[in-house]
């Protein structure tokens, strides 16, 4: 289900997932022996329409990265449940969910500039007011801009599977990041992951189940959840299903 994209070093899993550019160090409060990345290096040109959206819409919807707590009410102009999305790619899924759930605030972290421009363009065209973007690595954003118990949900959709065994350690869903995310969730808040790589799906269940603060929202023996209605089926996912490929959703909630 991985479409080829000759202009990039890594191939997105679907039309919404494009992970992006520069390494950061693990936050001080997370023990980890190596650098944590929430993205992979990508290339790609920003179209004129995307650049126009960055220039004209960006000042309204882009929140500058700063290593101090985010003022959610100031950023969104209201108090509302807060959802973080890590790596929104070209933004179609993010825009769809934000329109479907206008009562929630959606903060997307993405460093890939064409993706940022694409989501800004969608938000402007569809008059979506409950999206904000931080164009910075998500690990640093979570560690330094998000306080404990501030999130109602986290979305991680189709992260790079790093399917070769020797590359598995590069996967995004790892215990240090999950521990950090759990600390930022409110009691009852959720982490929702989706992948089309079965082995990674099982690893997601294992890693999330290994975090004491979380519990599986599913009672299924395999630990997987049904796809929530708010997550749309992308065109590549639909094509993969026709070819007999699977997609797995994993949802865990914070205890308490």
From Swiss-Prot:
The active site is at 160. Pathway: tRNA modification; N(7)-methylguanine-tRNA biosynthesis. It comes from Cupriavidus pinatubonensis (strain JMP 134 / LMG 1197) (Cupriavidus necator (strain JMP 134)). One of its GO terms (cellular component) is tRNA methyltransferase complex. S-adenosyl-L-methionine binds at residues 85, 110, 137, 160. It is an enzyme of class 2 (transferase). InterPro entries: SAM-dependent_MTases_sf (IPR029063), tRNA_(Gua-N-7)_MeTrfase_Trmb (IPR003358), tRNA_methyltr_TrmB_bact (IPR055361). This is tRNA (guanine-N(7)-)-methyltransferase. PROSITE patterns: SAM_MT_TRMB. Its EC number is 2.1.1.33. It catalyses: guanosine(46) in tRNA + S-adenosyl-L-methionine = N(7)-methylguanosine(46) in tRNA + S-adenosyl-L-homocysteine. Keywords: Methyltransferase, S-adenosyl-L-methionine, Transferase, tRNA processing.
């Amino acid at each position: 289900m991985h479409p080829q994209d000759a202009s990039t070093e890594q191939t997105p899993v679907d039309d919404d997932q494009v992970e992006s550019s520069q390494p950061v160090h693990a936050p001080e409060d997370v023990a980890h022996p190596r650098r944590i990345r929430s993205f992979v290096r990508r290339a790609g040109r920003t179209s004129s329409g995307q650049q126009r959206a960055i220039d004209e819409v960006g000042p309204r919807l882009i929140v500058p990265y700063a290593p101090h707590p985010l003022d959610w009410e100031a950023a969104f102009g209201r108090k509302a449940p807060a959802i973080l999305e890590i790596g929104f790619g070209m933004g179609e899924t993010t825009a769809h969910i934000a329109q479907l759930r206008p009562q929630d605030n959606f903060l997307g972290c993405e460093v890939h500039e064409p993706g940022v421009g694409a989501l800004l363009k969608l938000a402007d065209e569809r008059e979506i007011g409950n999206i904000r973007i931080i164009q910075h690595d998500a690990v640093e954003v979570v560690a330094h801009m998000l306080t404990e118990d501030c999130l109602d949900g986290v979305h991680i959709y189709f992260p790079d599977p790093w399917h070769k065994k020797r590359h598995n350690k590069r996967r995004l869903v790892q215990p240090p990041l999950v521990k950090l995310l759990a600390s930022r969730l409110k009691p009852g808040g959720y982490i929702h992951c989706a992948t089309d790589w079965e082995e990674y799906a099982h690893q997601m269940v294992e890693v999330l189940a290994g975090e004491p603060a979380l519990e599986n929202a599913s009672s299924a023996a395999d630990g997987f959840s049904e796809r929530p209605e708010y997550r749309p089926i992308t065109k590549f996912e639909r094509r993969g299903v026709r070819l007999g490929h699977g997609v797995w959703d994993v949802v865990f909630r914070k205890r308490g």
